Amino acid sequence: MSDQGNEHANHDGIDNAGLSAEVGSGPEAKRTRDEPPEQTASDEAVSNQSPDSTIGLSDAQVRAREAAKELLEYEFEGIIKIEAANGDGWRTVVELVERNAVPDTQDIIGRYEITLDATGSVTGYELLERYRRGDMKEEL
């Protein structure tokens, strides 16, 4: 087969336009290129963590965001700090818009600390400070 006139053919003369062509051999030979690979047992174990397993940094970030939205009921602005808390949990600092204003430099921002245990459950939260968005702030 010639490469001329067929922009989908590669140098081996194989037509790449048909993305449903079978790839590989063995048990995965039936999987097509446009299908995602099957999850392995280790992938499923990570995505289905038991409630007693410890969480990592990225899970702590997700849980802190969810907790801020649920517990504090203000518009979520962002997570500005996450750190391990004595090896048995996480300390996170989030910012929430407590009052919108015009101009937005006059918005009131609340900075809250949310603590999580090693499994990601919220163990407490505290308002650290409030400030206007336009005020110069020293970062944590």
Swiss-Prot record:
State its location(s).
Gas vesicle; Cytoplasm
InterPro entries, per database record: Gas-vesicle_GvpO
Q: Among the entry's GO cellular component annotations, what is one? A: gas vesicle
Q: Where is this region: Disordered?
A: 1-61
**Compositional bias (Polar residues) spans?**
39-56
Q: Name the domain of life this protein comes from.
A: Archaea
Covalent S-S links between cysteines? none
> GO annotations under biological process?
gas vesicle organization
What phenotype is described for loss of this gene?
A: No longer makes gas vesicles in H.volcanii; cells translate GvpA but do not make gas vesicles.
Ordered alphabetically, the record's keywords are: Cytoplasm, Gas vesicle
Which residues constitute the signal peptide according to the record? none
Kindly report the protein's main subcellular placement as a broad class: other
What triggers or suppresses the expression of this protein? Expressed from a single promoter upstream of gvpA; most transcripts stop at the gvpA terminator, with low read-through into downstream gvpC-gvpN-gvpO. Expression starts in early stationary phase and is maximal in stationary phase. Highly expressed in 25% salt, poorly expressed in 15% salt, no gas vesicles are formed at 15% salt.
**Where are the compositionally biased (Basic and acidic residues) regions?**
1-14
Q: Tell me the subunit arrangement.
A: Forms homodimers, forms a GvpN-GvpO heterodimer, interacts with GvpC, GvpF, GvpI and GvpL, might interact with GvpA.
State the similarity comment.
Belongs to the gas vesicle GvpO family.
- This chain belongs to the protein called Gas vesicle protein O
Organism, as annotated:
Haloferax mediterranei (strain ATCC 33500 / DSM 1411 / JCM 8866 / NBRC 14739 / NCIMB 2177 / R-4)
**Encoding gene per record:** gvpO
